[in-house]
Regions:
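Intrinsically disordered, low-complexity acidic regions enriched in Pro/Ser/Thr
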Residues: 1-131
């Protein structure tokens, strides 16, 4: 199965203002945590063209949460998400965010799921307790 490199953390740190405005239009819940930065480009034959991402609210809002990988994940938007690195348009923002340790890169199989179980967020095998 193919793997991709994803940024995991508060997506507000790595997206442009316009992209973040698009993200904020979604009303995320544990059953529907996926969105698209360019929904007008969505196609079942080229799913990645729409630049998909996944995002979930933290149970306790902003702060710093520790992942099962022992790393800290900082939050300023009350949410943690993941997006494939090749879907991030502003690589400079990504580099700055990684340098500051606000979020981290992870390799996931494209089929790895993510979800929320009462504040326990998971991305593949990575778990982040936010409750």
């Amino acid at each position: 199965m193919a793997t991709r490199t994803y940024f995991v953390g508060d997506l507000c740190y790595v997206l442009t203002r316009d992209e973040w405005d698009t993200v904020c239009l979604y009303d995320f819940d544990p059953e529907d945590n996926e969105g698209f930065l360019e929904p007008e480009k969505f196609s079942w034959t080229d799913y990645q063209a729409a630049r998909p991402f996944e995002m979930m609210r933290t149970a306790c809002g902003d702060g710093c949460y520790e992942g099962s990988d022992g790393k800290s994940y900082y939050v300023d938007s009350g949410s943690i998400g993941r997006i494939a690195v090749d879907c991030i348009s502003d690589k400079e923002k990504l580099a700055e965010t990684l340098e500051k340790g606000l979020g981290h890169l992870h390799e996931f199989d494209e089929e790895d799921s993510c979800g929320d179980d009462d504040g326990l967020l998971w991305f593949g095998e990575l778990e982040i307790q936010t409750a």
